[in-house]
């Protein structure tokens, strides 16, 4: 009887354990009441051919015939997703701009994780806006990539259209704007 009870309790504990998430905070306690809504774009599918590293004046057909398809080029097929994030700003001082910068950094992180195949969930974790992914999937991904000992870049970042220089200028301008608002 004791063994049966022990097995029952162990089984109940396994059922009650919730899913673990690895979260990256957006470093802001001034944004609260986070709500997200992800909906699929109804009625259509996207086929996107990303041509990259093609010499100037060479067409896609000529490149495929002469060189084959480059490993850096991808064709993306899928249904676009509309993601709505709603947040209330509780402090209207210079921290408002800092909050927006931190949130944009979180969105870049989320786009990278989404590009790698993770389902990103935004949530309020202990009062801090965070981008979360499934912990088991994250550990498997890190383990897989740390076991590979080569540093070949075999993908391009589809969602990153801003260069590091543009991001530095955007950060500088936003910080100057925050200082002017504080004065």
Swiss-Prot record:
Residues 23-157 are virion surface. GO terms for biological process: symbiont entry into host cell; virion attachment to host cell. The keyword Secreted applies. GO terms for cellular component: extracellular region; host cell endoplasmic reticulum membrane; host cell Golgi membrane; membrane; viral envelope; virion membrane. Residues 1-22 form the signal peptide. The keyword Transmembrane applies. The chain crosses the membrane at residues 158-177. Glycans are attached at residues 37, 88, 124, 134. It is a single-pass type I membrane protein. Residues 178-183 are intravirion. Keywords: Glycoprotein, Host endoplasmic reticulum, Host Golgi apparatus, Host membrane, Host-virus interaction, Membrane, Secreted, Signal, Transmembrane, Transmembrane helix, Viral attachment to host cell, Viral envelope protein, Virion, Virus entry into host cell. It is found in: Virion membrane; Host endoplasmic reticulum membrane; Host Golgi apparatus membrane; Secreted. It comes from the Viruses. Its main location: virion. Heterotrimer of GP2a, GP3, and GP4. The GP2a-GP3-GP4 complex associates with the E protein. Interacts with glycoprotein 5. Interacts with host CD163; this interaction plays a role in virus entry into host cell. Belongs to the arteriviridae GP4 protein family. Minor envelope protein. Along with GP2a, serves as the viral attachment protein responsible for mediating interactions with CD163 thereby playing a role in virus entry into susceptible host cells. This is Glycoprotein 4. It comes from Porcine reproductive and respiratory syndrome virus (strain Lelystad). The lineage of its organism: Viruses, Riboviria, Orthornavirae, Pisuviricota, Pisoniviricetes.
């Amino acid at each position: 009887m004791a063994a049966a009870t022990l097995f029952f309790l162990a089984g109940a504990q396994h059922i009650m354990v919730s899913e673990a998430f690895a979260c990256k905070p957006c470093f802001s306690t001034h944004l609260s009441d986070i709500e997200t809504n992800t909906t699929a774009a109804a009625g259509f599918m996207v086929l996107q051919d990303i041509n990259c590293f093609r010499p100037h004046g060479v067409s896609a057909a000529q490149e495929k015939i002469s060189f084959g398809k480059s490993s850096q080029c991808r064709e993306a097929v899928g249904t676009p997703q509309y993601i709505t994030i709603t947040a209330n700003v509780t402090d209207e001082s210079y921290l408002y701009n800092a909050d927006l910068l931190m949130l944009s950094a979180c969105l870049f992180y989320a786009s990278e994780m989404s590009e790698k195949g993770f389902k990103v969930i935004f949530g309020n974790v202990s009062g801090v806006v965070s981008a979360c992914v499934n912990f088991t999937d994250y550990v498997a991904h890190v383990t897989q990539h740390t076991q590979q000992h080569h540093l070949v870049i075999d993908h391009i970042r589809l969602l990153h259209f801003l260069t590091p220089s543009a991001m530095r200028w955007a950060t500088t301008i936003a910080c100057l704007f925050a200082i002017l608002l504080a004065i």
